[in-house]
Amino acid sequence: MWPFASVPAGAKCRLVETLPENMDFRSDHLTTFECFNEIITLAKKYIYIASFCCNPLSTTRGALIFDKLKEASEKGIKIIVLLDERGKRNLGELQSHCPDINFITVNIDKKNNVGLLLGCFWVSDDERCYVGNASFTGGSIHTIKTLGVYSDYPPLATDLRRRFDTFKAFDSAKNSWLNLCSAACCLPVSTAYHIKNPIGGVFFTDSPEHLLGYSRDLDTDVVIDKLKSAKTSIDIEHLAIVPTTRVDGNSYYWPDIYNSIIEAAINRGVKIRLLVGNWDKNDVYSMATARSLDALCVQNDLSVKVFTIQNNTKLLIVDDEYVHITSANFDGTHYQNHGFVSFNSIDKQLVSEAKKIFERDWVSSHSKSLKI
């Protein structure tokens, strides 16, 4: 019935946030806890979750969500949680707590063993989905600032479920040749919507390149294209910008996103605001990169601030016309090696709502000048 139905603006997407209780502002949007709770409550057939790691029991709200999942699984709802092979530290405890949930560890890069599953998304019944930067941890549900998108528009949920199928094909328990065969089966039907064919002004982008499949857009290509075509403004709220790729303990320069930001500021006079995170998970190059941008563009309209509370929000807004929400840092290692799905939209309402979030964060008491 989808081809004959009118497509709602923004594909029925709503922004979703986690805000720590010690912040000086609240959100009018759906909380991550409310979003995950609704997905579980409305599920009738299945719930699929992809996350680097799984540690919901670390906070009270995370534990409540996991208990709801346990209840759903006991009622016969099929629940699969994909974890990266290197993010399975708490797996034994969770399996003993709820044996009816199927936990699958994946390795998306058995050949080189450098790629990780970074994607943070939920899909249920091909009807509802969440994608953003909230992993399936108690912190992301309760104590760490995150941003994502929830939709109950079935075509969009189905399109995201195809990504789940792709990542699931890299089950680390399978032989490598089985991984390749399984992936080959799901890649040809890997997406229905992309930058040239958005649905309601919405589409997903993907990484890394070897998992793209037919007609998917490489996330780095879309991000860099948007940065290079920016005319008036670029607003970035990210945990880190790191112009390097790490392989086997060695660092290699990867300036693609970094250069695109500098070119926009210096060559085209674009107004740029960069709000970076500052906590112990940051790459050593992150603050150095922020300072170098601030210094190099001192004669241009580029401002840098640091968010002082744990902030895993990863948001890009260009010309107040395009919004990008992802689970990856603007980091060469993430973009060259890791597996994730990003949300993109040119829908005016969604862009406007995301812009309000950025403005709120930018002027809050938690945002400090880099020069202080």
From Swiss-Prot:
One of its GO terms (biological process) is viral budding via host ESCRT complex. Late-budding domains (L domains) are short sequence motifs essential for viral particle budding. They recruit proteins of the host ESCRT machinery (Endosomal Sorting Complex Required for Transport) or ESCRT-associated proteins. F13 contains one L domain: a YPPL motif, which might interact with PDCD6IP/AIP1. Gene3D superfamilies: Endonuclease Chain A. The gene is OPG057. This is Envelope phospholipase OPG057. GO terms for molecular function: phospholipase D activity. Pfam families: PLDc_3. It is an enzyme of class 3 (hydrolase). Interacts with protein OPG190. Its EC number is 3.1.1.-, 3.1.4.4. It catalyses: a 1,2-diacyl-sn-glycero-3-phosphocholine + H2O = a 1,2-diacyl-sn-glycero-3-phosphate + choline + H(+). It comes from Vaccinia virus (strain L-IVP). A motif (YPPL) lies at residues 153-156. It is found in: Virion membrane; Host Golgi apparatus, Host trans-Golgi network; Host endoplasmic reticulum membrane.
